[in-house]
Amino acid sequence: MTDPPYRTTSRGNCLGGGMFKKKINLKGQVFTYNNTDCSEYAPEFYRVLKDGSHCYVMTNHVNLVNILNVFIESGFHFIKSLIWDKQNKIVGTYYMSQFEYILFFRKGRGVKINHCGTSDILSVQNKKTKDENGKNYHDTEKPVELMKILIDNSSKEYDIVLDPFMGIGSTGIACKELNRYFIGIEIDQTYFKIAKQRMA
């Protein structure tokens, strides 16, 4: 389960502003490691996962088709797309952004989720963890409660959950609360330190 780095828009609006407008660096990126190609990691996900495992990949509309195609080419079976309803809107040039895609794959044989009555629209408020100055630790942080829904549906107690792009550790916190073992990987040392502190 992961929220990999992908191309983001500056989300400019009709007034010329944008969520990430002031955070884009000289390379035109919002984050230091913004443009990791999914063809580099999708085959590795498939290699390390057990047969029957579920795989959740979060993305936006810009990268949806590419990620879907690459994961299928890597051997995954696409089950369906889920929607994360953030319960808040971000002003854009056209329609306001309120949701993100969660692509739901499996490796090998089909295994049902644990709670078959779960809706494919997951309404979880988009809250950010902030530092002492009120600044977001991570601008694309995913809520722990959202991760708990996915983990609870696709694993049992003491199973191992992998998040290769763990950011500031929401998946790890969810695993801790649900009695799952967790393997988290993060290349950005600032985020890695924050994740360790949050999971301590």
Model region roles, listed by residue range:
Residues 1, 6, 10-24, 70-200:
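Class I S-adenosyl-L-methionine
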Residues 30-87:
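Conserved Class I SAM-dependent methyltransferase catalytic core
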